[in-house]
């Protein structure tokens, strides 16, 4: 979490960089509420996504990017709550203009469930120590 603290104070942050896992859970809860609010607004306007909304309105709805530096730390402190928020966001947030960048050193199912992993369209892995970790990251198995 120290890596992201260097970004503290840049002008486009919606909130300060959060380094406490408990506070991160409450912020993720706010992001879920924001996503639901955006869905209600887009439904009222009759559009399917943020791009459609922004084409119809002078006051554009901004995109939100949520960056989670170490998912396993969050899962240790507030596992089920974090899992529920991330799962909901990974399934529905893109249309509302909310995107998640999530990092972890351990891509195992106790950190990132199969449902969450299936809803992230892109994965990047720099280096793994053993081959089975490649399968966990890329979510495929050789039979």
Annotate each PLM feature.
Residues 26-143:
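P-loop NTPase motor-domain active sites and their immediate coupling elements
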């Amino acid at each position: 979490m120290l890596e992201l603290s260097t970004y503290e104070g840049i002008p486009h942050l919606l909130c300060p960089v959060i380094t406490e896992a408990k506070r991160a859970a409450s912020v993720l809860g706010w992001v879920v509420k924001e996503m639901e609010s955006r869905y209600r607004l887009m439904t009222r306007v009759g559009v399917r996504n943020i791009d459609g909304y922004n084409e119809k309105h002078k006051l554009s709805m901004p995109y939100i990017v949520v960056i989670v530096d170490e998912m396993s730390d969050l899962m240790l402190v507030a596992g089920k709550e974090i899992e529920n928020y991330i799962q909901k966001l990974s399934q529905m947030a893109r249309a509302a203009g909310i995107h998640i960048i999530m990092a972890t050193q351990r891509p195992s199912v106790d950190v990132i469930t199969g449902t969450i992993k299936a809803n992230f369209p892109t994965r990047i892995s720099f280096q793994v120590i053993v081959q089975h970790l490649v399968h966990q990251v890329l979510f495929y198995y050789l039979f």
